[in-house]
């Protein structure tokens, strides 16, 4: 009887933990998702692209306020009217709070990045969104 009870309890614990892991993985970490799209002045200039990548990677690596970080280029997805893929780079950062995102805006690493790289882009578009429960 003890063995059956232990097995049943173990199964219950494993099942509960799996459900919790599954629920956690459904949603992005962070209250605020900060999505930034960059259009470079000279996207075909390898030297300028390398300079931009060096600056933005330094920003991402030295930023201690973001929970999750992503740097990417347009995906090679199906061309459709609703798909915007004219940008050169996308950076996504998630923050635990509005305060953390505000601190990031004024952080020396962010300001240094802007100063070092602003001459390399012709357009920047930012989309900030607050996480909703799903």
Which ranges hold each PLM region?
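A short linear boundary/processing microfeature
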Residues: 107-110, 119-120, 132
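Short, exposed beta-strand-loop hairpins at the edges of beta-sheets
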Residues: 102-105, 115-117, 121
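Short S/T/G/P-rich N-terminal loop/turn motif that feeds into the first structured element of a domain
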Residues: 18-92, 96-102, 130-134
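Sec-dependent N-terminal signal peptides
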Residues: 5-13
């Amino acid at each position: 009887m003890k063995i059956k009870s232990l097995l049943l309890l173990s199964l219950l614990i494993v099942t509960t933990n799996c459900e919790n892991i599954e629920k956690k993985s459904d949603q992005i970490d962070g209250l605020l998702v900060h999505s930034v799209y960059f259009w470079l002045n000279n996207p075909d200039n390898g030297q300028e692209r390398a300079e931009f990548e060096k600056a933005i990677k330094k920003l991402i690596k030295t930023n201690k306020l973001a929970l999750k970080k992503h740097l990417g280029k347009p995906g090679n997805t199906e061309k459709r009217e609703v798909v915007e893929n004219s940008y050169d780079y996308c950076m996504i950062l998630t923050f635990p709070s509005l305060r953390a995102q505000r601190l990031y805006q004024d952080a020396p690493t962010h300001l240094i990045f802007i100063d070092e790289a602003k001459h390399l882009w012709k357009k920047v578009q930012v989309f900030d969104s607050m996480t909703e429960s799903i």
